[in-house]
A protein has these predicted regions:
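Conserved N-terminal structural module of periplasmic/extracytoplasmic solute-binding proteins
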Residues: 1-108, 124-127, 170, 307-310, ...
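Short helix-initiation/N-cap motifs at beta->coil->alpha
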Residues: 76-85, 104, 178-183, 260-273
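Extracytoplasmic/periplasmic solute-binding protein
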Residues: 27, 143-149, 154, 180-233, ...
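Hinge/lid segment of periplasmic solute-binding proteins
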Residues: 103-155, 217, 299-303, 367-373, ...
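Long, aromatic- and glycine/proline-rich binding clefts that accommodate carbohydrate-like moieties
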Residues: 296, 300-303, 350-403
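Extracytoplasmic/periplasmic substrate-recognition and gating elements
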Residues: 61, 65-66, 166, 252-255, ...
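Short, solvent-exposed loop/beta-turn-alpha elements that line the ligand-binding surface or hinge
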Residues: 119-130, 173-177, 200-204, 223-242, ...
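Glycine-centered hinge/linker elements that transmit conformational signals in sensory
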Residues: 187-189, 229-261, 305
C-alpha cells in the first residue's frame, strides 16, 4: 500500500539519498583506537522484535558482502537491558560502535559527548531527505549525532465483532472523522455496558518506558509540557488538568484493566490477542506480532486515536548512533549511512512494518509484509506530531522526565493523588531535571 507524501510529511515537516548497496567506499581501515577488538568490525547493539531482528541480520550480512573483510557483530538484547548495558559499557570504555536509541532518549546521549558528531560524515543529499522534525530530533546544538532510522506511531486496533455486539456501527475512517474525546467516551461506555463479563473496552500503551505516550492527550488539549524555552514547565494549566482528569477517568470508569497502568506489566497487544479488550492502542511495529498471535481466530481492523482541540500522537521510532569510542569512526559512520540508504530503509520498513524517515520514500509503494491495509491509517496518524511536540520530547533531560511521568501518573491513576498535586509534582520534577 502506498504511504502518501502528504500524509507523512504534513505534520512532521512543516534529493533522494545515495544508495549504498552496491559498494560502500570512503572509509579508512586505520581508524582510531577504541572499544572494538578489530578496526574492520562494527559492533551493533540493539533490541528488536522478531521482524526487526530478521531485517537487521539481513542488512548486516549485506554490509559485509559489500565491504570485503568487514564484519558486523550484531548484538540483540532485550529492551529492558539495552540502556543499562550501553551506559555501563560507555563508562567502562567498551561501548558498541553503533547502537539503537529511541528519540525521547536521544538527547541524553547526544548532550554528553558520548556520541560521534556526524557533521562531516553526512552529505546534504541525505540530510535534506530526512523528514525535518525527525532530523531535528537527532541533533544537539545544531550538530547531528545520529540518523533517523524509522518512525512509528500509535493507532487503535479493534475487533469489529465486539463493536457489532455492543451496537457500535460507525468507526472513523479518516483523521477528520476521528472520534472526539466525548464520542470516544460514549463508545467506551457502550462497550462496557454491552459486553459484560471480563471484557473491558480498551487498554493504552503507556506502560513503563512508554509513559511519555501520555503526552499525546496533553498535546490534544492544546497544552504543553515545556514552555518555548524547552526548559521551563508549562504543564500546570487548564489543559494539563483536562488531560489528566480525562485519562484518570479511564480507571474510574473501569474502561481499562488495572494491570495496564503506567507502571503495569501487562501490555495492550497481549490482552487484545487474548480478547480481553475490544480495542488496543498499539504502535504499527506491533502489527506482525498481533497478526501472528491472532492468525485467523477473529477479524481486527484499525482506526485513529481520538482528538480534542487537535489530533496528536506519540513520537515513536528510533535513531541509529555511533559512539565516540568507536574503533573505526569512518567505518561506523559508513554503516549508519548504509542502514538509512533508501533501498535498505525501504526493505527494513517493509519487513518490520514501520514508517520511513526519508522524504523520498514517502508516497512510494512499500510492500509491507503484514497487514498493508492498516499501515496507511498509522501513516496518516503520524502527521499529527508537530515539530513543537518533537522539540519537547527530545530535550537532553527527557529521559528523567519519562521516569518522572511514570511515578506521577501512577500516583494519580492508581493511588489517589489529586490532579493538582500531580501537575505540581511533574512541574517540580521538570525544573529539577532541567536544572540538573
Amino acid at each position: 500500500m502506498p504511504v502518501s507524501r502528504r500524509q507523512l510529511l504534513a505534520g512532521a515537516s512543516g534529493a533522494a539519498a545515495a544508495t549504498w548497496l552496491n559498494g560502500c567506499g570512503g572509509f579508512s581501515r586505520s581508524g582510531s583506537s577504541g572499544a572494538s577488538t578489530s578496526r574492520d568490525t562494527v559492533t551493533f547493539m540493539t533490541w528488536a522484535s522478531d521482524a526487526e531482528a530478521s531485517a537487521f541480520t539481513r542488512l548486516a550480512s549485506a554490509f559485509e558482502s559489500a565491504n570485503s573483510g568487514v564484519t558486523v557483530d550484531l548484538r540483540i538484547v532485550p529492551f529492558g537491558e539495552m540502556f543499562t548495558g550501553v551506559d555501563a559499557q560507555l563508562q567502562s570504555g567498551t561501548a558498541p560502535d553503533v547502537f539503537r536509541v529511541d528519540y525521547p532518549t536521544m538527547g541524553l546521549y547526544s548532550s554528553q559527548g558520548q556520541l560521534l558528531d556526524l557533521t562531516d560524515h553526512l552529505d546534504s543529499a541525505l540530510t535534506d531527505d530526512f523528514i525535518p522534525a525527525l532530523y531535528q530530533g537527532v541533533q544537539f546544538d545544531g550538530a547531528p549525532y545520529g540518523v533517523p532510522h524509522q518512525t512509528d506511531t500509535t493507532c487503535i486496533v479493534y475487533q469489529p465483532a465486539m463493536f457489532e455486539a455492543a451496537g457500535i456501527t460507525s468507526v472513523p475512517d479518516s483523521l477528520d472523522s476521528a472520534w472526539s474525546w466525548e464520542e470516544f467516551s460514549a463508545v467506551a461506555d457502550q462497550l462496557k455496558a454491552r459486553l459484560g463479563g471480563d471484557v473491558l473496552p480498551f487498554a493504552y500503551d503507556w506502560q513503563q518506558a512508554g509513559a511519555f505516550r501520555w503526552l499525546t492527550w496533553l498535546f490534544e488539549t492544546g497544552g504543553r509540557l515545556l514552555e518555548s524555552d524547552l526548559t521551563s514547565p508549562a504543564i500546570v494549566s487548564a489543559e494539563g488538568a483536562k488531560a489528566l482528569e480525562f485519562t484518570r477517568s479511564f480507571f474510574e470508569n473501569e474502561w481499562i484493566p488495572n494491570n495496564t497502568s503506567v507502571k503495569g506489566a501487562t501490555y495492550p497487544d497481549t490482552i487484545f490477542v487474548s480478547q480481553k479488550i475490544a480495542m488496543a492502542f498499539v504502535g504499527d511495529f506491533l502489527l506482525p506480532g498481533l497478526d501472528e498471535g491472532i492468525k485467523d481466530r477473529f477479524e481486527w481492523q484499525a482506526t485513529y486515536q481520538p482528538k480534542d482541540v487537535r489530533a496528536s500522537t506519540d513520537l515513536g521510532g528510533n535513531a541509529l548512533v555511533a559512539t565516540e569510542q568507536a574503533s573505526n569512526k569512518d567505518l561506523a559512520a559508513e554503516f549508519l549511512r548504509f542502514m538509512v540508504a533508501s533501498e535498505n530503509m525501504a526493505s527494513s520498513c517493509e519487513e518490520a512494518v514501520e514508517l520511513p524517515t526519508l522524504q523520498s520514500l514517502v508516497g512510494e509503494q512499500l510492500d509491507y509484509a503484514t497487514r498493508p491495509d492498516l499501515v496507511p491509517t498509522f501513516a496518516e496518524q503520524s502527521t499529527t506530531m508537530t515539530a513543537e511536540d518533537v522539540a519537547q520530547i527530545t530535550t537532553p533531560f527527557f529521559g528523567q522526565i519519562n521516569i518522572l511521568l511514570q511515578e506521577q501518573l501512577e500516583q494519580c491513576f492508581v493511588n489517589g493523588q489529586s490532579v493538582e498535586d500531580t501537575l505540581s509534582g511533574i512541574a517540580e520534577g521538570v525544573e529539577a531535571a532541567a536544572g540538573g
